[in-house]
A protein has these predicted regions:
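Short beta-strand/turn micro-motifs composed of small residues
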Residues: 9, 32, 97
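Helical element adjacent to the flavin cofactor pocket in flavoenzyme catalytic cores
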Residues: 140-178, 182-187
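N-terminal Rossmann-like FAD-binding beta1-loop-alpha1 element of flavoenzymes
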Residues: 3-29
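Dinucleotide-binding Rossmann-like beta1-alpha1 core, especially the glycine-rich loop
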Residues: 46-130
Length: 196
């Protein structure tokens, strides 16, 4: 059997790393000096929004691929652990400032060139959503790619999936040995630079 990999940090990033390792057959142990979701992952809402599609680059492509894969990935997490992560692909509506129409046209052209067709970005004068922000121009930019997640529920769902798959999560514990460090800014302090 493969040697266990330690992941330091039980926020969304650390737990997601551990879950992906387990999915690939690698035993893992997650440690957190406090508790699951103690840092930024203990927040109320997370937006999973795509980078602006104009001036495309490799970083934007990697992020797009992750957003496209998110539906299935979070569904697998929910199924494995029996806990809803609070993920939904909700789309996004943004008011367009007066005079920004040409810039929005560039953005829409970039989305058409790089995003999957179902993700559609478009301008509208009649948004179909119950909450519509004020738009001085009378235009809104909408997309179907943006998603949202509950960080707290995501952590709970990932922890449940990890435990269901045989992974260990130890709270109130640190590690001195080699690990995947996913401890956020607070965990960087011992490495110097005041976490910067």
């Amino acid at each position: 059997m493969a040697r266990e990999i330690v992941v330091a940090g039980a926020g969304v990033f650390g737990l997601a790393c551990a879950w992906e390792l387990l999915r690939r057959g690698q035993p893992v142990r997650v440690v957190d000096s406090a508790r699951i979701g103690a840092g930024a992952s203990g927040g109320h809402v997370g937006a999973l929004a795509p980078h602006a599609p104009e001036t495309w680059n490799a970083k934007k492509q990697v992020q797009l691929e992750a957003l496209v894969a998110a539906d299935g990935w979070w569904a697998d997490v929910a199924e494995a652990g029996g806990t809803d992560p609070g993920y939904a692909r909700t789309g996004r509506i943004q008011p367009v400032p007066a005079g920004a129409e040409a810039r929005m046209a560039e953005r829409i052209a970039g989305a058409r060139a790089h995003w999957p067709g179902w993700a559609e970005m478009a301008l509208t004068t009649t948004p179909d959503t119950p909450l519509v922000p004020v738009s001085d121009s009378g235009l809104w930019l909408v997309d179907r790619l943006t998603a949202r997640i509950s960080p707290r529920r995501a952590c709970a769902a990932l922890a449940a999936a990890i435990r269901a798959r045989g992974g260990e999560i130890a709270e109130g514990v640190t590690t001195e040995g080699p690990a995947i460090w996913a401890t956020g800014v607070a965990g960087l302090g011992p490495f110097g630079g005041n976490g910067v």
